[in-house]
Design a protein with these regions (language model features):
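Short periplasmic/luminal acceptor-recognition loop of GT-C membrane glycosyltransferases, typified by
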Residues: 362-366, 376-426
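Extracytoplasmic catalytic/substrate-binding loops of multi-pass membrane glycan-assembly enzymes
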Residues: 13-28, 36-51, 61-73, 83-87, ...
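Membrane-interface transmembrane helices that cradle and orient dolichyl/undecaprenyl
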Residues: 110-115, 150-168, 176, 200
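Signature aromatic-anchored transmembrane alpha helix within multi-pass, membrane-resident enzymes
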Residues: 1, 171, 213-216, 280, ...
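Transmembrane-lumen/periplasm boundary regions of multi-pass, lipid-linked membrane glycan transferases
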Residues: 25-35, 175-178, 184-283, 294-308, ...
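Short helix- or helix-capping micro-motifs
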Residues: 2, 120-125, 173, 177, ...
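Short acidic/glycine- and proline-prone juxtamembrane loop motifs at membrane-interface regions
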Residues: 132-142
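Transmembrane-helix motifs of polytopic, lipid-linked glycan transferases
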Residues: 75, 82-111, 149, 153
């Protein structure tokens, strides 16, 4: 069921929800394939503009997450040349999300019991937000796998003190951190696990103190390394509280109503979330600590979370577990028929309204980008640098299969920096002005392609 749901429109071009971020991620993989060389220390992507970092990025450096996922995908794509990059990248995300479902089952079975584990895995499998973000070309599906895997293995280590589980937990945590340093907000979960087993003298085991040091050495080394490429480091200070929204009424509304209640739970699913408060047992410590980590994450990364809903991927596992646990609490506390009726109604309505929110995410809003991009790919040299104005949105540039600029203006400056082609889906003043000066390769109702290296006589 989980696989079938995730295959819905998996052949979408990179032009659905958050296409700009997907395009940036996918283009790192594509540049590796094009270069026929996988240099993990110097990842490059399509955008040569100064939009991300404030500095011209003519080498196209992309210094964000450590690109081991992109490198792995590129290696497979280079080996099997008939594979479509976008389709395969989406499929890889789907497959890793299937493994995350297995890990959630194993983790919850250890903390609670098999019944809650099965239900948590099911909720994670069918939650509309989870389904959509399990087939995107982003680091998030991999981050969720490695972070939950690390927690699971750490729980096993705390329980049995096995070296294998300890080492696997470090590896999982290190890889998660290399993708998203936000994994640090899951620290309360690790601390709660330690507390649960503190009577077994786990606090005297030096390995628990070494674990965060060993796990975070790679990301600290990566962060130090990328300082050598300032033009490839996107500005990130704004993520914290760039617009001053932290703890304001709008912050509460966006994160807890618009996202959690509306987008994740479809309004009605919040009944299951609240039902968790009716049952307190030893497992609640770990789950409550997980929610504490979520709250700290929302407070610290305030603007980032409000601005982009994909930042809430981090909370998916605990949301799924809490929905499942709340459902079982209702089943336990109420009479069988009443509980069944409530569960069916709340689940059905919650899924319906959440799906209604998410289905629009699959829509392609700019088919003209696809058409224009294909035309550029067929007409111009493979190494041509392209200006594809979309107000900085890189999804249009991605469709051209070329590097370049996702924004117009200062065209002469861009030509001096190597721009060869101008393609636009808006026949605006800029396109008209360039049409007067340079040779037009194609002009249709949907787009215009101009050769910036061929001036009219």
């Amino acid at each position: 069921l989980a696989l079938i749901l995730r295959l819905y429109r998996i052949n979408n071009p990179v032009a659905d929800w958050h296409a700009f971020r997907q395009a940036d991620t996918a283009s790192v993989t594509r540049e590796y394939v094009k270069a026929d060389k996988i240099d993990l220390l110097r990842p490059r992507y399509q955008d040569l503009s100064n939009i991300q970092s404030g500095l011209d990025n003519l080498e196209g450096y992309r210094m964000v997450e450590f690109p081991f996922i992109n490198g792995g995908l590129a290696l497979i794509l280079k080996t099997f040349k008939n594979l479509d990059l976008v389709f395969f990248s989406r499929l890889a995300s789907v497959l890793i999300s299937m493994l995350t479902i297995v890990v959630i089952y194993q983790l919850v079975k250890e903390i609670s019991d098999q019944k809650l584990a099965l239900l948590s895995a099911l909720v994670y499998a069918i939650l509309p937000y989870s389904v959509f973000y399990s087939r995107v070309i982003l680091p998030e599906p991999y981050f969720l796998f490695f972070s939950t895997f690390s927690i699971w293995q750490f729980y096993l280590f705390a329980k049995n003190r096995a070296w294998t589980a300890y080492l696997l937990s470090i590896i999982g945590l290190a890889l998660a951190a290399l993708l998203k340093p936000f994994v640090i907000f899951l620290a309360p979960v690790f601390l709660a696990i330690i507390w649960q087993f503190h009577q077994q003298k786990i606090l005297k085991d030096p390995r628990i103190y070494l674990l965060p040091i060993l796990a975070f050495i790679p990301i600290l080394a990566w962060r130090e390394w990328i300082k050598n490429f300032p033009s490839g480091i996107p500005a990130s200070d704004w993520l914290f509280n760039g617009n001053g929204i932290r703890l304001q009424p709008a912050w509460l509304r966006w994160l807890f109503y618009e996202r959690l209640i509306k987008l994740f739970l479809g309004y009605f699913g919040s009944v299951f979330l609240l039902a968790n408060l009716l049952k307190k047992n030893k497992e609640i410590l770990i789950y409550a600590a997980w929610w504490l980590g979520v709250l700290i994450y929302f407070v610290v990364i305030a603007t980032g979370n409000v601005q982009h809903d994909y930042y809430q991927n981090l909370i998916l596992p605990i949301v799924a577990i809490s929905i499942a646990r709340g459902l079982l609490v209702i089943q336990e506390k109420l009479k069988k028929k009443v509980a069944l009726l409530i569960i069916i109604l709340v689940s059905g309505l919650g899924l319906f309204f959440a799906s209604k929110q998410i289905l629009g995410y699959y829509n392609i809003n700019h088919w003209e980008y696809i058409k224009a991009g294909k035309a550029v790919d067929q007409l111009v040299d493979q190494n041509a640098l392209v200006i594809a104005p979309a107000m900085g949105d890189t999804q249009f540039l991605f469709q051209t299969n070329r590097r370049g600029w996702p924004i117009g203006f200062e065209i002469e400056d861009k030509i001096n920096k190597g721009a060869d082609i101008y393609v636009s889906t808006n026949y605006d003043w800029e396109a008209k002005k360039l049409e007067e000066k340079y040779q037009v390769l194609v002009h249709t109702d949907d787009y215009i392609i101009i050769d910036l290296k061929a001036e009219k006589p």
